[in-house]
Amino acid sequence: KSSAASDVYKRQAQNNLHPNGLYLFDEPEAALSPQRQLTLLMQIYSCAKEGAQFIIVTHSPILLGIPDADIYCFDNGRIHLCEYEDTESYQVTEMFINNRQMLLDRLLTD
């Protein structure tokens, strides 16, 4: 299970995130449960309020939801600012949660 990896990541984040830093994260959610992603969201938000800057590549609708974040989307070779609700990660997650059985029926039917 990935809990050992997520514990290591959490400890590193707690010990290594400082105000006024610049941080580059590439899919930090990969080893994190949704609960750990929420913890990371709180840590990032707290440091950002103190002046730290973050560039995060993510597909996580949780991390995309960091308050006051500028979200850049990559569509058809174009990079542009977009709203949280307009991200593919949000839309697919919302569709799955709100229409799980219908979506599964469509996807899993021959």
How should these model regions be labeled?
Residues D26-P28:
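Walker B catalytic acidic pair
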Residues P19-L22, E50-I55:
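Loop/turn-to-beta-strand initiation segments
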Residues A30-S33:
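ABC ATPase nucleotide-binding domain "signature" loop
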Residues R11-N16:
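Conserved alpha-helical scaffold flanking the Walker A/P-loop in AAA+ ATPase domains
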Residues K1-A5, Y9:
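Single conserved hydrophobic/aromatic residue that forms the stacking wall/gate
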Residues G21-L24, L40:
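A short alpha-helix capping/helix-coil boundary motif
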Residues Q35-Q53, S60-D110:
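C-terminal lobe/lid and adjacent interdomain/linker elements of RecA-like ASCE P-loop ATPase modules
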